[in-house]
Regions:
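Short acidic-aromatic low-complexity motifs
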Residues: 53-57
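C-terminal catalytic core of tyrosine-transesterase DNA break-rejoin enzymes
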Residues: 159
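Extreme N-terminal basic, low-complexity initiation segments
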Residues: 1-10
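Short, Lys/Arg-enriched N-terminal segments with co-localized hydrophobic residues
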Residues: 12, 16-32
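Vicinal oxygen chelate
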Residues: 32-50, 60-61, 67-156, 165-190
């Protein structure tokens, strides 16, 4: 069983071989097997979320239309449909992946339940949430100011991924945040 999973995993990376011209990534099975480890690739984020989706192109379009993401890499799967993409949103990276037999990750369930929420900072949360809605997102929590100094709104994209979209509107100290939270907690008990 595990040898079959490993073979599928390696075949998955065979079609994902890529060398990005902007020094982002250089991955292939051969690199993993024969090159010395370099830790974090030059130009890469230490943590890169991988969003598994039923429709990779729709998720790419959502990220571009909502966040102004830049598509850096797109690779087809065995069926020639888009199966992998690397996007950047500001300095952050995000990978969009198709479902792949044998891998332990799946897209969110149709009801949108997911153990992961992506928190993304933008220049204008209100306009970004409007763009998200225009791109097919559903508002989960409307945009409002928070005690820690962010203005945030929660949306679920058409693929079922949940995003907290935020703009920092006020710099606060930990003491200020604690005092505000204490007031909120006291008011909620009334």
């Amino acid at each position: 069983l595990w040898s079959g999973v490993a073979a599928k995993f390696l075949s998955y990376f065979k079609f994902l071989q890529y060398k990005h011209a902007h020094r982002i990534l250089c991955w292939s099975p051969e690199v993993f097997m024969t090159s010395a480890a370099k830790g974090i690739p030059e130009g890469a984020s230490a943590i890169i979320p991988r969003l598994f989706c039923r429709d990779v192109v729709a998720e790419i379009d959502f990220c571009i239309n909502t966040f102004g993401a830049v598509e850096r890499v797109r690779r087809p799967g065995p069926d020639q449909r888009a199966a992998h993409a690397l996007l950047t949103i500001g300095p952050a990276m995000i990978m969009i992946e198709a479902e792949w037999p044998g891998l332990p990750s799946r897209p969110p369930t149709p009801d949108g339940s997911s153990p992961v929420v992506i928190y993304v900072y933008v220049e204008d949360v209100d306009k970004t949430v409007e763009r998200a809605i225009a791109a097919g997102a559903k508002v989960l929590f409307p945009v409002q100011n928070q005690f820690w100094g962010d203005r945030i709104g929660w949306v679920m994209d058409p693929s079922g991924h949940v995003w907290t979209i935020a703009t920092r509107i006020e710099e606060t100290t930990e003491e200020e945040r604690q005092a505000r939270l204490s007031r909120i907690m006291a008011e909620s008990k009334k």
